[in-house]
Amino acid sequence: METFKLAKRDIVLGVRKKMRYPVFVIVCLIGCMNFSGLMEDGLELFGKSNPSMANCFAFIFQGIEPMIRKNTMSEFVIPPVWLMLMLLYLLMPLDYPIKSMEVWGSQYLIRTSRRSWWNAKCIYTIGINILTFLLQIMIIFLFCLIKQMPISMHNNQKFYEALYGGNGVHSSLEISVWGNILLLIVLPLLGIVAMSMFQLFVAVWINPYIAYLLSIGILVCSVLLDSPILLANHTMTIRSALVCENGIGIGEAILWCIGIMALVWIMGVLFVKKKDMLVLKKEDV
């Protein structure tokens, strides 16, 4: 109960007065408007069905073909909306855990334990990512309502192929409603949470700036290579799971994400006993 009380307090304080959320809303709206332009310019992409909410999710989380497979590196391009969203997802929970340790470290040692502090920060990181993802879902939902698009998680294989210039879809997964929920909601969220947990560990034990730079490096490397250890691949699920032949399967991706989250959490529990939580900022001394 002590851990959950701390986590609840952390989430409230971590969300309060964050100017990043208006920026996140703007980036989500840019993605939706880009999709709206696609609807107007290429209705043939949607086959016989009307554009749906699933199509909008697919457009935002599609990713691009791994650059290492391109004939020339001059074609190196990072999907701008995807990159901005990922940078904001990773930035949202980054600073608060360190600030809480700097400002209230002594109070944690007096009133609770290091282990409770770490567990609360893990729950905080997961909670912030879920809240931010729900915000994105709400924005896309409202966009679909305004555009009078079906609120459906159903689309077809031809749409996925069209996003990649006619490349075939290499997957035995039936692209059903539940298949799309896995591809477009569950897996991207798990990928974001796994990256944020890894970032939390590096931020607490090394430095938050180094942690964020490492996250940016993972994002860039994920555009180059389709490897499960590069966690950002799991947020480009159509590319990784459907378009790349011998790509990352849905089950494999879920196991990687959950495995990294569990590993980071357990390592934190083991190492936090020796963590100095009485660090003060220079201006506080």
How should each PLM-predicted stretch be described?
Residues 1-24:
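Aromatic- and glycine-rich beta-strand/loop motifs that create alpha-glucan
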Residues 23-26, 192-196, 241-285:
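Alpha-helical transmembrane segments of multi-pass membrane transporters/translocases
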Residues 24-28, 207-223, 282-284:
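Central hydrophobic cores of alpha-helical transmembrane segments
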Residues 27-42, 222-228:
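Alpha-helical transmembrane segments of multi-pass membrane proteins
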Residues 32-95, 122-200, 204, 239-257:
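Secretory targeting signals
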